[in-house]
Amino acid sequence: MPKNTLHIKNIDIQTTHIMLKTDINCDIKPFIQNQREIILNEIKENPNFLKSYTPIPLIDKKPILKLMTKAGEIANTGPMAAVAGSISEMCLDYLESFKSKFSIVENGGDIALKTNKKINMGIYAGKTSFSYNYGFKIKPKPYKYGICTSSYDGPSKSFGSTDATIVFSKQSSIADSLATSIGNYGNGNTENEVVHNALSYAEKYSDYYEGVLVIKGETLGKTGHIPQLISINNTHVKEAFEIE
């Protein structure tokens, strides 16, 4: 796919920071604003939607609230653990409604994508040597695919100490909540112990993901099937994505 056929946008709305690459030329910002308003209105009506660290009952059945609540139920987290991944997933669904064949939606590191080309993407794992030096080669995904990351020093609350807990799933909403849940169990006295504990806990959710990769310091471990790990030398890949 020639790069000039892609529409590349950065959309910032308060705490939502979207990087978009898509073959669809449309103004998606009003859609994102609407999803945010739905979430904020729910928080006003039900403050526990924001505060809970455990699953809560669904009251309003708007699609994005259903995604967040379901993801929380699966991963045993509160719905806000899935907020970034759910916004990404809703944006991808919106682009798919226009027959998109290539779309990448990144929301603060939580990614929903559908591609007809291989792409390379970098890993960010704090101050470890893996950050910006290694990444993944993602095969074409003609269906929805989610890649979400949680870390102890990220913008969202984590009770674990992993530098990166990366989950690959068919839904970015679920990948997001699972990254939080699995990352919460990444604790221990050594790097190996942190990685082992997170991956051991991940096994109970194996029906909901394709693979999980955990990084602590200079130690890396994985379970399930993850994309091919690659060394990255291209500066562009370190900052975003490279299309093959």
From Swiss-Prot:
Gene3D superfamilies (UniProt xref): ApbE-like domains
Superkingdom of this protein's organism: Archaea
Coiled-coil regions listed: none
Cysteine disulfide links: none
InterPro entries given in the database record: ApbE-like_sf, MA1715-like, UPF0280
Membership in a protein family: Belongs to the UPF0280 family.
Protein name: UPF0280 protein Msp_1322
Organism phylogeny: Archaea, Methanobacteriati, Methanobacteriota, Methanomada group, Methanobacteria
